[in-house]
A protein has these predicted regions:
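N-terminal beta1-alpha1-beta2 submodule of the flavodoxin-like/Rossmannoid cofactor-binding fold
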Residues: 2-97, 102-117, 195-203
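Residues at the starts of beta-strands that form the adenosine-phosphate
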Residues: 17, 45, 137-139, 170
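Short histidine/acidic/glycine/proline-rich micro-motifs that form metal-
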Residues: 24-28, 146-149, 179-180
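Hydrophobic residues at beta-strand termini and immediately following loops
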Residues: 49, 142, 174
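Short, well-ordered alpha-helix to beta-strand connector turns
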Residues: 90-91, 136, 168
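Conserved nucleotide-sugar donor-interacting segment of glycosyltransferase catalytic cores
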Residues: 117-127
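Short, glycine-/small-residue-rich phosphate/pyrophosphate-handling segment
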Residues: 125-165
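Glycine-rich phosphate/pyrophosphate-binding loop and the adjoining helix
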Residues: 152, 157-203
Length: 203
């Protein structure tokens, strides 16, 4: 099920489509709260994919065979490519995912596997190197961590995938860390990130 939400949050109209990939699990997610502050500043037309509601499936042998058959025919209209088409056509992308086990929730990896469709979001040169086909010029990655945000196996992976495989030239990390460590005020740390977004980002 493709979750779509369209909004106009900015006083200045923009025609760009911003895709919000929401990998947050909790209803009161701090990561989502920060991401929505960013979306409010970006404005324009927005579509949201709530990964927890997508029932994403791993790429089994049967699904891989089916996908290969379709891509070899150049048939990208099949419903199994709906999320990939949406990702490819977005002008700007915001991914929100908490920092879990030095990385991010498994559902985000499932999403990336499902949208990485050769011929749609990426292709390969004669030398075997990926060449991105995505329209987006920038990808934002929003995350929060209960402790220190190290090592970086989440944004670093997303950044490399975006630039080297999807053809998205610019990426930016927004993070709040130490949220569950005694002596740190989680609300203040989240509020500080939101204030930074409101002061620095605007169209």
């Amino acid at each position: 099920m493709l979750q779509i939400q369209m909004r106009v949050n900015s006083p200045e109209w923009r025609n760009d489509m911003i895709l919000y990939v929401n990998a947050c699990v909790r209803a009161d997610s701090r990561t989502d709260r920060i991401a929505r502050a960013l979306l409010e500043r970006l404005g324009g037309e927005q579509e949201e994919v709530r990964l927890g509601e997508e029932c994403l499936q791993p790429l089994s042998e049967e699904r891989l065979v089916r996908r290969t058959e379709l891509t070899e025919r150049g048939d990208y209209a099949d419903p199994m490519f709906a999320l990939a088409r949406q990702f490819q056509s977005a002008d700007e992308i915001v991914i929100a995912a908490p920092y879990w086990d030095l990385s991010f929730p498994a559902v985000l990896k499932l999403y990336l596997e499902n949208i990485y469709v050769t011929g749609l979001v990426s292709t390969y040169t004669e030398e075997g190197k990926p060449h991105g086909l995505c329209k987006a010029k920038k990808l934002w990655y929003v995350t929060t961590a209960g402790g220190p945000y190290v090592p970086d196996f989440s944004y670093g992976y997303i950044r490399t995938l975006a630039r080297e495989c999807f053809g998205i030239p610019e990426t930016e990390l927004i993070r709040a860390e130490m949220l569950d460590v005694q002596g740190y005020d989680a609300r203040e740390l989240v509020a500080r990130q939101i204030e930074m977004i409101r002061n620095r980002i605007g169209r």
